[in-house]
């Protein structure tokens, strides 16, 4: 029997959930979840993550929080009835934005009531306060939706159990390349019930602004945060150049990035003109190295003949596995390649690649199983199927390895580019 309420148990959802979670994990080379102890267990929980990588943000949050969670998504995705039904099945509610017009915004009142009911029944609700995605290590202005939902819930049952907003930071190794890394960090929760009492005001608008300020602060502390202004590109490029020598856990990498950015900001305050000039130079360097097809990672180590020779041997050694992977996963990466060319918003490309993987797991996988056991002895069939499992991500990993390998060779023939990078780093250290 289908569930009547979005937060109720559903057998189909429970069967699909572990399959989705497994595919999400396999879509990243490394994954990490930190701060789960910060999720309260004594009240209603609203999760508030940053929004930088379209649907993948919701998927990594879903996998990171094993508890059943209801999500909010932009309302225009629900315009088609079939899509709306699928969204309901996936526990996703429509969230109307101000840009959708006042008449539509009023519909949020109905959604708000469902959110409050969901929270009252102990099911977490996840909403992206920024309202729209932006592939950048920064934050946009937080919308009012998350605070209105929290205040409505607090008004209804805050006297029985507290309402919390948990800030969440999502960090990716790359926004656009498939099979990178993902880090989810839960921060210290804001006890909205206690926060409202401390304000001693009754006007909702007066409550929202302090909450917005506090949540923005806590969210920015959970990611590699850079103010999104004209110096953003220069600061991010400089941060990457200075962090190349550090190879730690995902959490340590993020903390190291934050330390470097803090140092950059301090130097900017002391010597604004010199730092402005350096950041402009860093932004120019980034454009030049991209134009020459040189990866930022090629600057991490000296590109000696020995290093290139070893990489050549590695590429040749892995080539048979790559050919097998390319053939075995051809229907998947072929469709993915077509979709990635069609999609204009680069931030959606990883979502498309994941979608193909998930669809392949549910369709192409069973077909391969049926064919393998139809034409091969069972032990050969099992062996072949086990070999096929990692082929999709390995195909992308090998392509990335070759991309960086070619980049290393290009850099070895571009000493001026290496000198350009060294000049930026040395200048920074003297400021």
Residues of each region from the PLM?
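Terminal low-complexity segments of carbohydrate-biosynthetic enzymes
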Residues: 269, 277-294, 302, 324, ...
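Transmembrane alpha-helical segments and their cytosolic interface motifs
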Residues: 297-329
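Long, charge-rich alpha-helical interaction segments
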Residues: 213-298
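Short, charged, low-complexity loops and linkers
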Residues: 201, 241-242, 312-313, 317
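Soluble catalytic domains of membrane acyltransferases
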Residues: 6-203, 321-431
């Amino acid at each position: 029997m289908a569930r009547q309420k979005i937060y109720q148990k559903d057998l189909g959802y429970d069967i699909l959930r572990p399959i989705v979670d497994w595919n999400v994990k396999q879509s990243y080379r490394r994954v990490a979840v930190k701060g789960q102890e910060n999720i309260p267990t004594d009240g209603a929980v609203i999760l508030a993550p940053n929004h930088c990588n379209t649907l993948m943000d919701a998927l990594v949050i879903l996998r990171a929080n094993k508890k059943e969670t209801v999500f909010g998504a932009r309302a225009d995705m629900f315009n088609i009835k079939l899509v709306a039904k699928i969204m309901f099945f996936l526990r996703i509610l429509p969230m109307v934005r101000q840009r959708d017009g006042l008449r539509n915004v009023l519909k949020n009142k109905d959604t708000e009531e469902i959110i409050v009911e969901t929270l009252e029944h102990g099911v977490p609700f996840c909403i992206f306060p920024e309202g729209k995605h932006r592939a950048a290590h920064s934050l946009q202005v937080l919308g009012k939706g998350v605070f209105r939902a929290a205040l409505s819930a607090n008004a209804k049952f805050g006297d029985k159990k507290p309402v919390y907003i948990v800030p969440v930071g999502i960090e990716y190794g790359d926004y656009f390349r498939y099979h990178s890394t993902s880090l989810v960090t839960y921060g210290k929760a804001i006890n909205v019930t206690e926060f409202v009492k401390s304000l001693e005001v009754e006007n909702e608008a007066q409550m929202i602004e302090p909450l917005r300020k506090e949540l923005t602060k806590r969210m920015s502390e959970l990611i590699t945060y850079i103010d999104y202004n004209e110096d953003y590109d220069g600061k991010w490029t400089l941060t990457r150049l200075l962090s190349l020598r550090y190879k730690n856990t995902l959490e340590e990498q993020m903390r190291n990035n934050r330390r470097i950015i803090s140092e950059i900001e301090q130097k900017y305050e002391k010597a604004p003109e010199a730092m402005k000039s350096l950041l402009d130079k860093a932004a120019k360097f980034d454009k030049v190295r991209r134009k020459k097809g040189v990866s930022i990672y090629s600057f991490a180590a000296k590109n000696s003949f020995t290093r290139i020779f070893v990489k050549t041997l590695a590429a040749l050694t892995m080539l048979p596995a790559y050919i097998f992977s390319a053939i075995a996963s051809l229907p998947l990466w072929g469709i993915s390649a077509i979709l990635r060319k069609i999609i204009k918003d680069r931030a959606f490309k990883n979502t498309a690649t994941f979608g193909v993987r998930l669809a392949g797991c549910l369709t192409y996988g069973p077909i391969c199983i049926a064919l393998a056991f139809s034409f091969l002895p069972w032990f050969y069939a099992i062996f072949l199927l086990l070999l096929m499992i990692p082929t999709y991500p390995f195909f992308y990993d090998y392509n990335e390895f070759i991309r960086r390998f070619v980049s290393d060779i290009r850099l070895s023939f571009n000493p001026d580019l290496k000198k350009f990078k060294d000049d930026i780093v040395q200048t920074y250290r003297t400021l």
